[in-house]
Amino acid sequence: LSNDYERSNMWRYRDYVVRSFNKDKPYDQFVIEQIAGDELWEVQPKGKKDSDLLIATSFLRMGPWDPAMVLKPQARQLYLDDVINSVGQTFLSTTMRCFKCHDHKFDPLPTRDYYGFYATFAATQLAERQAPFVKMENLIGLNQGKESTRHMLDFSKKKYHELLDKQEMAAKAWYDKRGKKYLEEDKRRSLPDEEKPPRYVGLSPIEQGRLKVRRQDDWIWTRRLERYEPLVQSVYNGPVPKSLNARKMRIPKKIPEKPFPKVHILMGGALEAPGDPVKPGVLSAIGLPTSGDPKNPHVLTNEKSGRRLALAKWIANPSNPLTARSIVNRVWQRHFGKPLAGNPNNFGARGKKPTHPKLLDWLAFDFVEHGWKFKRLHKLIMLSKAYRQSTKHPQIQKLRNEDPENRLLAYREPRRLSAEEIRDGLLVTTGELNREIGGFPIKPEINMEVALQPRMIQFSLAPAYQPSIWPKQRNRRTLYAYRVRGQPDPFLELFNQPNPNDSCDERVSEAVTPQAFTLLNSDLMNDRAIALALRVEKEFDTLRLQVKRAVQLAFGRVPDKQEWNQLEHYVKKMEKHHIEHKPDRPEYPTSITRSLVEEATGLPFEYEEILPAFESYRADKKSHQVDPKTRALADLCLVLFNTNEFMYVY
């Protein structure tokens, strides 16, 4: 896997997707740009090149695999396998891995078609490419982000050079003693052992370990500075580079003009067992030809450039029966909580049959007929009688007995909010949500133990998670939160935020005991409860009106008389409790001591990691900062947040 190295500019792809939906970009264009935007960009005239086309191809860089593993051919195969499967599942609702090693067991998909896709992407190489910032990109916080990242980099460099200078002084002494000319570390690395000093000359085993850590930190923070540069994780067409460096992948100044190796069907999916050669191609079962050759109607161009563009146009062809059905099925699922066709990533024989096949066909036809436009599709669905059904029905029990899965859509099924919707809903209710669109990733406050726990990456430990300093920065939509595969937000993970390593066709909404504990006890929930209490206190003077307003904000309705009296009584009762019990004051560390074992000697060593974000951190209001009355009102707000009425869409 990718060792959790940060892909610093991936925020630009996220913003490209948001811009595309907001502009109501036609879906066929959206598909083509993500698969072959760089090929479109190449033919644009100088001075009129659209950065969005390069940014769009970050879709091909979203997978978990690191292309610079020790076993480079295997790493390359893993990357291509992930891209092929992602394209198949996302745009065609077809699980491509099912016919990688042999012909598909249940669908008319031969292995040759899989390797036709493989050949299509065989010329695709990874690179961070220059792409000027576009007018619509939000660059707020660029200078502040650069400054804080450089502060961490400067600290790492200082510690690194202190150890390196000590090592090189000892190396000079070694050369002087032998009457030889001093050579710097990089220049002497390839020499035989007898012609150079020991590798870590002059350093103790503990210092050796620290030197390795600081060298890695130097690279990590240098890499993170790229987040603020006009770069984009993209691709280009060319032969496989002789050497791959995951730390700095740049497009060559001149791409070598050499023939690409032929792609073969791999018997059993093994690189060591090549079979018949294969040309770039598409899925023959669709019956949509791509060439005028009657013997090979489903092959694509064999030129190094244009393969992906030809594939993208085939996918986005109005006559392709899968593409439009795949996306309208997902849109329907987003509105109703479940799709028309039961497996959004798999329309094959092993997927569930559509409950309303004619409706799916009609929606797909209508979607294409009206320009592949999403906003019209959303409006069409949301104005339908089926969508506007109530969750209440006079014969609900009879319906549940006769149609337990509600396939006939006789009533609206309640849906629990997703992990991101819960957090965003809390911020909307408290009035704290920052509705800015786009920009650099923000870091919400997460559980402190998780934020500071050691997290292994290749050769070292990853830097600790430091939240954004200001509440306005932290309180943006969860869409804009910094996300790293090896350190998920425990709150979001607990409420079934999907694993980012694989395409998620359907959210799980299981209810488990830890969710209840988290909703009552987590810092996120208690901080939002205090924020809501402070909001209603600011808006109204009397407790009775404050209670009414809290219910109105949380539920979108006013409490009935019985609820009102009970809730008011509860607040008065809790105020007495808080007068007698004072809350603890949380502490934020400004540095942390890490412990590791030096791999060459097996000896333990420690080093310091600074946490400058907490030196000027502006935390959310905590219990110790408000009076007993506010804490009691916050307890009421916490109760409201824990109800089904808040957690579910009815």
Q: What kind of region is each of these model predictions?
A:
Residues 636:
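Globin-like tetrapyrrole-binding proteins
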Residues 465-468, 479-480, 513:
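Acidic, aromatic-lined catalytic clefts of primarily extracellular/periplasmic carbohydrate-active enzymes
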